[in-house]
From Swiss-Prot:
The chain crosses the membrane at residues 2-22, 53-73, 80-100, 111-131, 136-156, 162-182. The lineage of its organism: Viruses, Varidnaviria, Bamfordvirae, Nucleocytoviricota, Megaviricetes. It comes from Invertebrate iridescent virus 3 (IIV-3). It is found in: Host membrane. Its main location: host cell. It comes from the Viruses. Keywords: Host membrane, Membrane, Transmembrane, Transmembrane helix. It is a multi-pass membrane protein. This is Transmembrane protein 022L. GO terms for cellular component: host cell membrane; membrane.
Length: 225
């Protein structure tokens, strides 16, 4: 199986890394504390909690980079998409440097907020990748679902300890819609333009019409005489 056929697997891994990173970042410390108390009857070391926080952020960022790489490989000849991915990387790097100077960044990292800005800044580029109005509105709807689930519904569920909420299904639905839209590349030519066939196909189709090169059996020659 070629690497291109494995892109859905990498896409699924990227989505899993994003969801796992969010879970580890916001719920990992609580889970680790409960497990540590039940097993050792003691509080969790501070370094373990910090490791849990930063591991979640690392997974989150790796997931976004994986998703961007998969979409880029599916549309590697599209300069707009390539520029949008590079722009998002630059924006996230600059934003990280600026927020790192704040004291609150150490105790409450804001890196997940960067992904929201990356999504919004990428909307124009993503919309430009599609020619049809239906695809454009589908992309906008998927982006709204992802932002709503990740920054409204999921934080609300964590705040009120809602276990079986709709946040995670909404997040998965948004990513699934985006994948379905971008799973089929854009046609390289506008609608209505005839695409020339390869030379070998023309030769095969035109072979019966090439009477000069056709060898006539002797029986047919006798009938002609």
């Amino acid at each position: 199986m070629s690497f291109v056929h494995k892109l859905p697997t990498f896409y699924t891994a990227g989505v899993g890394a994003i969801i796992g990173g969010l879970s580890l970042r916001f719920n990992g410390a609580k889970f680790l504390s409960d497990w540590y108390i039940n097993k050792y009857n003691d509080s969790v070391p501070a370094w373990s909690l910090q490791t849990c926080h930063w591991a979640g952020i690392a997974l989150y960022c790796v997931g976004w980079v994986t998703l961007a790489s998969v979409i880029y490989l599916k549309h590697r000849d599209n300069s707009i998409l390539k520029g949008s991915i590079l722009s998002c990387i630059v924006i996230s790097a600059v934003w990280s440097i600026l927020e790192y100077n704040q004291d609150m960044f150490v105790s409450n990292p804001k890196l997940p907020l960067i992904s929201c800005a990356m999504l919004v800044s990428s909307l124009a580029a993503l919309v430009a990748l599609k020619y049809h109005i239906k695809d454009i509105f589908t992309i906008l709807g998927a982006a709204i679902i992802i932002i709503l689930a990740e920054y409204v519904v999921l934080p609300y569920q964590r705040q009120y300890n809602i276990v079986d909420g709709i946040g995670l299904p909404l997040l998965l639905l948004g990513f699934f819609i985006l994948y379905q839209v971008f799973s089929v590349p854009n046609p390289s030519t506008p609608t209505g333009v005839m695409v020339p066939k390869p030379e070998d196909e023309w030769d095969i189709e035109m072979a019966p019409l090439n009477h000069r090169d056709r060898q006539v059996p002797e029986s047919e020659l006798e009938n002609v005489k």
